[in-house]
């Protein structure tokens, strides 16, 4: 099979390629480009699983970045086991065709306990005293020590949170090139997250985005020069486009105010209690799964959600077939936001009763995606010395809570998850092998076919 690298530049759309991305502009002019009709939800886990299986979410089962695990009555986000994906993966199929085929997965999701030959993925150490230490997980296990000895510890806090920078993306790029030098895999999948941050914080129209575009352009230039120099075919693609928003919608507050959602009180704060709730929403950017305990009440909950400002479409039962989300993991009801809105997870009615994890970066405890984790509370006076003191306490071994995340969802200016109004905001795929991409628009399931054609 032919050596191929797939570079996933998160959030890259045709509208962002231009003066701020001189290399990508020049490279794309020599390449064939197709718009990818977004999968729903247009989020990381669902898009990537669709790309590397060639199947829709109702087949591969990845209905979002998280969902309600009905057997344990818990909402879980960002799980990593590849066994959650319920369809054959491209590397397994390619290996059946060519036993010498090898694959490196560099930070695409569902990258633990996988059948790829080489993998690297973020995996912090969670210590008993509450500390979270930057680290990564690799296969083979010794690869972790090699990469972190050469490039330093994976910069977790530059990968997600208020201080995200190009450092995490550059680390992934460096690690990818090193894995290629060491093992020369046939197929390499690379995830570059840098654009995901300020496009959500500021929105795609903010002039400050130009700096981010220049930074990712430089990383792409380095990667493409490296891989083309090693005879690899390069595919550039993205998962979704991020569009301007100005209205957060708290579906769980609506459900609570109407008697469907239950909470548990702990030390004066409130925890969402999904197992005790008649209905609740698991929100994921611009799409929400609403889980309804009693199927006889689906119609009334659907009617309630349909009337919420910012909700564009509500689908239940077989109506979900149209967007390929009829799967046991999906909610009984699917809600889609309108173009200017997105769904926040908030369920408390008084900020004083918000749980302690609401004000920190805590991707696993929150019952929904929270982009506000990328913003430090602008109302905190003397933020820098306050953070420095907390870090000092952490280094001295004291417990501390980095509670600097605001409870103001209106701060978010960009989102994704639905199909954008303009194709200029669709995700894209680019390759210099024009004969392998005859269309100008493809379905997300066809990304699998494009990659396979390059390999063959």
Locations of regions flagged by a protein language model:
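Beta-strand elements within well-structured catalytic alpha/beta cores of enzymes
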Residues: 2-15, 27, 51, 94, ...
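Short, solvent-exposed loop/turn segments at secondary-structure junctions
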Residues: 11-14, 41-42, 57, 108-113, ...
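Short, structured active-site-proximal loop/turn typified by the sulfatase FGly-forming signature C/S-X-P-X-R
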Residues: 15-59, 104
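A short acidic (Asp/Glu
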Residues: 16-19, 115-117, 200-202, 245-249
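Secreted, luminal/periplasmic, and some membrane-associated catalytic domains
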Residues: 19, 37, 42-43, 66-83, ...
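His/Asp/Glu-rich, glycine-adjacent segments
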Residues: 55-203, 215, 276-282, 286-293, ...
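Conserved alpha/beta core surface patches that mediate binding of polyanionic ligands
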Residues: 171-178, 183, 268-271, 405-413
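Short glycine/proline-rich, acidic loop/turn segments that cap or connect secondary-structure elements
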Residues: 412-431
């Amino acid at each position: 099979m032919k050596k191929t690298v797939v570079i996933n530049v998160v959030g890259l759309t045709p509208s962002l390629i231009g003066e701020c991305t001189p290399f990508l502009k020049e490279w794309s002019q020599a390449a064939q480009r197709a718009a990818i009709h977004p999968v729903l939800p247009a989020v990381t886990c669902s898009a990537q699983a669709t790309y590397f299986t060639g199947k829709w979410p109702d087949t591969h089962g990845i209905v979002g970045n998280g969902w309600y695990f009905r057997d344990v009555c818990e909402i879980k986000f960002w799980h990593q086991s590849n066994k959650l994906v319920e369809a054959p993966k491209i590397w397994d199929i390619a290996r059946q065709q060519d036993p010498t085929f090898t694959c490196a997965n560099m930070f695409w999701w569902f990258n633990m306990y996988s059948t790829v030959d080489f993998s690297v993925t973020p995996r912090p150490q969670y210590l008993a005293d509450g500390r979270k230490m930057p680290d990564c997980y690799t296969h083979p296990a010794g690869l972790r020590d090699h990469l972190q000895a050469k490039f330093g510890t994976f910069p977790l806090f530059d990968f997600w949170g208020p201080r995200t920078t190009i450092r995490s993306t550059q680390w992934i790029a460096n690690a990818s090139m090193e894995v290629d030098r060491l093992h020369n895999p046939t197929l390499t999948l690379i995830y570059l997250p840098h654009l995901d941050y300020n496009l959500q914080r500021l929105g795609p129209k903010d002039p400050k985005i130009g700096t981010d575009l220049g930074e990712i352009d430089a990383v792409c230039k380095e990667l493409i020069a490296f891989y083309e120099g090693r005879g690899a075919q390069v595919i550039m693609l993205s998962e979704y486009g991020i569009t301007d928003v100005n209205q957060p919608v708290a579906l769980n507050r609506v459900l609570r105010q109407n008697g469907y959602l239950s909470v548990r009180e702990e030390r004066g704060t409130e925890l969402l209690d999904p197992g005790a709730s008649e209905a609740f929403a698991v929100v994921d950017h611009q799409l929400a799964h609403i889980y309804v305990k009693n199927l006889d009440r689906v119609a009334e909950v659907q009617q309630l959600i349909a009337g919420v400002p910012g909700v564009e479409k509500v689908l239940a039962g077989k109506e979900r077939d149209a967007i390929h989300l009829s799967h046991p993991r999906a909610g009984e009801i699917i809600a889609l936001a309108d173009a200017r809105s997105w769904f926040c997870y908030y369920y408390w009615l008084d900020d004083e009763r918000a749980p302690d994890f609401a004000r920190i970066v805590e991707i696993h405890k929150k019952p929904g995606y929270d982009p506000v984790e990328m913003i430090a509370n602008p109302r905190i006076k003397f933020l820098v010395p306050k953070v420095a003191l907390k870090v000092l306490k952490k280094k001295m071994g004291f417990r501390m809570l980095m509670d600097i995340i605001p409870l103001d969802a209106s701060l978010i200016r960009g989102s994704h998850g639905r199909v954008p109004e303009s194709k200029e905001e669709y995700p894209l795929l680019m390759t210099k092998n024009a004969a392998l991409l005859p269309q100008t628009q493809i379905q997300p399931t066809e990304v699998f076919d494009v990659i396979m054609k390059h390999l063959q």
